[in-house]
């Protein structure tokens, strides 16, 4: 399937749950459900799609992110703070509010943006 132009987000603000993330065109597995994490296979597919539309680099899907180009997360180490521009897979509608692990509910964003979103 072809990538949609830009792949930016159009979020439902009315709480209807009809988010349309930048990967909504990808076909979900039958195991998709509320409160679930994205699988390793889903993450790999979304990274590939993101890089296809961004000339081989991973870029944030959210225009409000602090960073445009994102870096691969390093292995977590005790006492080492991760880089704020590492990519993370964000549930557009949070899991604790019934958000699913559907492709349509995901955006790739920086660690900083995702962490600050948690604190709102």
Predicted segments, located by residue:
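Low-complexity, glycine/serine/proline-rich disordered segments
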Residues: 1-51, 70, 80-85, 111, ...
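Short metal-coordination and nucleic-acid-contact micro-motifs, chiefly zinc-binding Cys/His arrays
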Residues: 52-58, 102-106
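Short cysteine-rich clusters marking metal-coordination/redox-active sites
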Residues: 57-65, 110
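Histidine-centered nuclease catalytic patch
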Residues: 66-108
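Active-site or metal-binding loop neighborhoods of secreted/extracellular toxin and effector enzymes
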Residues: 102-120
């Amino acid at each position: 399937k072809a990538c949609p132009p830009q792949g930016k987000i159009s979020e439902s603000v009315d709480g209807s749950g009809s988010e349309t993330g930048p990967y909504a065109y990808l076909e979900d597995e039958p195991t998709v459900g509320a409160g679930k994490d994205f699988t390793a296979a889903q993450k790999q597919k979304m990274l590939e799609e993101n890089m296809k539309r961004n000339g081989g680099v991973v870029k944030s899907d959210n225009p409000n992110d602090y960073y445009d180009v994102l870096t691969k997360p390093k292995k977590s180490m005790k006492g080492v703070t991760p880089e704020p521009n590492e990519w993370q897979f964000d549930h557009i509608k949070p899991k604790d509010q019934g958000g699913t692990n559907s492709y349509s509910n995901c955006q790739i964003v920086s660690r900083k943006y995702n962490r600050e979103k948690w604190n709102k």
